[in-house]
Amino acid sequence: MKMEEAVGKVEELIESEAPPKASEQETAKEEDGSVELESQVQKDGVADSTVISSMPCLLMELRRDSSESQLASTESDKPTTGRVYESDSSNHCMLSPSSSGHLADSDTLSSAEENEPSQAETAVEGDPSGVSGATVGRKSRRSRSESETSTMAAKKNRQSSDKQNGRVAKVKGHRSQKHKERIRLLRQKREAAARKKYNLLQDSSTSDSDLTCDSSTSSSDDDEEVSGSSKTITAEIPETGFCYVVQAGLGLLGLSDLHTLASQSAEILWDSHLA
């Protein structure tokens, strides 16, 4: 009986020691998997290995994820032993700015972020037409704005120079009633003066012969001095039937005076016609 009890106790001890051995085997497998993962990561490339080695917390998380995936795939039918991980508050790697959850705050750049400038440069080199079109559009807008500003500045300078020179710009608009009336009166005065001078020219040309005859008959009266006095000469014109009075200061009108009178009357008539 004592032997049987001793054998039972030994078997119980063996059974109690068997699960720790299984757990030790599982931890050994996990370590082997992590070593294999590290070797694969080192074989990927020098750039990736340098980035991962610079971030030990990321390496630890990758190891943990790979070990969990391997255990889930190989030992899905076996109950996995629970593994205790440190909390986020106690894990200094998770609190550090270089952790995977805070890559945006870290000073180091990942491979994707490093590749972004190179991709932008390749895009610019690959499509120069789009870049040239954008630059041409910007240049055209800039040239248009510069031309508008230059025209505005030239207009302002012209207005300021006109004000300094005393010139007032003509205001185009409807004429007032007073202005129209004044223009009409001036036109009437010019027409009346032109009509008088024209009549004087016609009468002087027709009565020139009569005046010469009267002057020859009145030669007896020429003994008197006429330098300081004026002499009135009347001549009857048969065509018109009225007398024309010529007021002569020093003498009769000559041909040169008639020519100047005709030219002046012609100019006045032309001005009245234009008005």
Curated annotation (Swiss-Prot):
- InterPro entries per UniProt: RNF111_N, ZNRF3_Arkadia_E3_ligases
Q: Which Pfam families match?
A: RNF111_N
Where does this protein have compositionally biased stretches of type Basic residues? 169-187
User: Which UniProt keywords are given for this protein, alphabetically ordered?
Assistant: Coiled coil, Nucleus, Phosphoprotein
Q: Which residue intervals are annotated with compositional bias (Basic and acidic residues) in the record?
A: 1-12, 23-32
Query: In the UniProt record, does the keyword Phosphoprotein occur?
Result: yes
Determine if Ubl conjugation is one of this entry's keywords.
no
Modified-residue entries (Phosphoserine), positions: S66, S67, S143, S145, S147
List each coiled-coil range: 175-200
Stretch list, region Required for interaction with CSNK2B: 202-226
Q: Where is the composition biased (Polar residues)?
A: 87-121
Highest taxon, organism lineage: Eukaryota
Q: Where is this region: Disordered?
A: 1-50, 63-233
List GO terms (cellular component aspect). nucleus
Residue ranges annotated as compositionally biased, kind Low complexity, are 203-219
Q: Where in the cell is it found?
A: Nucleus
User: What does the subunit comment say?
Assistant: Interacts with CSNK2B (via KSSR). Interacts with JUN; the interaction is mediated by CSNK2B.
Can you name this protein? Protein ARK2N
| Gene name tied to this protein | ARK2N
